Each structure stands twice: as structure tokens, then as C-alpha cells.
């Protein structure tokens, strides 16, 4: 499909790819290539083609097509491509609150029972459709920050409706555990303290 209008306007817009820590990017990788990501942000990897090997201090994991992988902040993973492939990557420095029915206390109750281990999620059909829609925009060089923000909100709607609380607690544990424990502490005690 040919983009008919708008890209000329986007080229000089200050919101065209200005936020480098909160955005989707397409990453193509060759066989045996080492893959790295900034530790200053968290990253969700959507493997669309190929297979990668992830190593940490404890173990080695091999993951492939239709898997999502979360790399938390200050992660210490070594990643190597086992085959040629393509992934969609969402980098983020904060998480999005998109639904009033998803509150910190409910997620925290689920997370308190979790013993974390490296975990991936299978991309269910709505998540695959979502990833394809983001790739469509990236393939057509549409990098608008407003589109990026709307897609970042949309992904959490997909998580909300198509994954269980337990799946999400295991998957997002590396980035949510500290934030949610502090948030719950504040919400529980805010009436008892003079300042927060």
C-alpha cells in the first residue's frame, strides 16, 4: 500500500521520532549476531522471525517465533541470534496506566505469590495482529511520537483482555515489583503520614 499524504509534514515535525527511550523499532538480525539493548530502559522483544539465545548468570534460554521477551531495567543478559530474523522492540522507561480497573493493589496481590524465573509469553492472535500493525507503520517510515504513544497504550489493552493476571505478573515482574511495592506502601499509609 502506498502512503499518499502526510510524510512530508512529518519530516519537519518535532514529534517525529524525538523520544528514543519510549518507542517501537524494527530490528533485523543476522545469524550469530550479538544483539544488545540500552540498560537505561526496559524492552519487550516480539520475535517475528528467527531464533535467539539469551544468557544470564544462571541459565541459557532459546526463544523463537511468536514469543515475547521482557528485559528489565539494568538487565544483564547476553543475546545472540541463532538464525537470521526480525523482531519488534518496545523500549520504555515508564509503564502506562490505561484502565482504572487495573489497580496496583490487585496486581501486587498476584505478584506477592510469584517466585520470579525468566519467563516469556506466547503472542496470542490479537497480539500478533497488534505487532503486524506496528510493523506496517514502521515499514512505511511512519515514526510519529503520537502514533508511538497510542500504540504503547493499545498494547496494554491487549495485555489486559487477552492474558491472565498470573501470566502478566510473571512476565512483568522484573519491572513492576519495586514500583508496585512502593506504590502499595504509599496507598496503604498515605492517611497516616504527614508527607509523602
Predicted segments — roles?
Residues 123-135, 152, 169-195:
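A short, Lys/Arg-enriched amphipathic alpha-helix from helix-turn-helix/homeodomain DNA-binding modules
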Residues 104-129:
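Aromatic/histidine-rich interaction motifs
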Residues 6-11, 59-60, 119:
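Hydrophobic alpha-helices of bacterial signal-transduction systems
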Residues 17-111:
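N-terminal regulatory/effector-sensing and dimerization cores
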Residues 139-153, 172-173:
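All-alpha amphipathic helical-bundle segments outside canonical DNA-binding/catalytic cores
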Residues 1-18, 137-143:
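A short, N-terminal "cap"/entry segment at the start of jelly-roll beta-barrel domains
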Residues 32, 163-171:
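Short, Lys/Arg-enriched N-terminal segment that forms or immediately precedes the first helix
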Residues 159-166, 189:
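A short secondary-structure junction motif
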Amino acid at each position: 500500500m502506498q502512503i499518499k499524504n502526510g510524510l512530508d509534514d512529518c519530516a519537519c515535525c518535532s514529534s517525529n521520532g524525538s523520544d528514543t527511550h519510549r518507542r517501537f523499532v524494527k530490528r533485523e538480525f543476522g545469524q550469530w549476531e550479538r544483539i544488545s539493548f540500552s540498560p537505561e530502559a526496559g524492552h519487550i522483544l516480539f520475535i517475528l522471525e528467527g531464533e535467539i539465545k539469551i544468557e544470564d548468570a544462571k541459565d541459557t534460554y532459546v526463544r523463537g517465533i511468536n514469543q515475547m521477551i521482557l528485559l528489565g531495567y539494568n538487565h544483564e543478559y547476553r543475546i545472540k541470534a541463532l538464525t537470521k530474523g526480525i523482531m519488534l522492540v518496545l523500549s520504555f522507561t515508564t509503564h502506562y496506566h490505561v484502565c482504572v480497573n487495573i489497580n496496583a493493589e490487585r496486581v501486587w496481590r498476584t505478584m506477592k505469590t510469584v517466585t520470579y524465573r525468566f519467563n516469556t509469553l506466547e503472542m496470542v492472535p490479537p497480539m500478533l495482529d497488534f505487532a503486524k500493525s506496528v510493523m506496517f507503520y514502521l515499514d512505511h517510515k511512519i515514526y510519529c511520537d503520537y502514533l508511538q504513544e497510542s500504540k504503547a497504550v493499545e498494547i496494554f489493552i491487549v495485555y489486559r483482555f487477552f492474558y491472565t493476571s498470573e501470566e502478566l505478573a510473571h512476565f512483568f515482574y522484573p519491572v513492576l515489583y519495586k514500583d508496585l511495592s512502593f506504590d502499595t506502601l504509599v496507598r496503604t499509609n498515605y492517611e497516616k503520614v504527614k508527607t509523602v
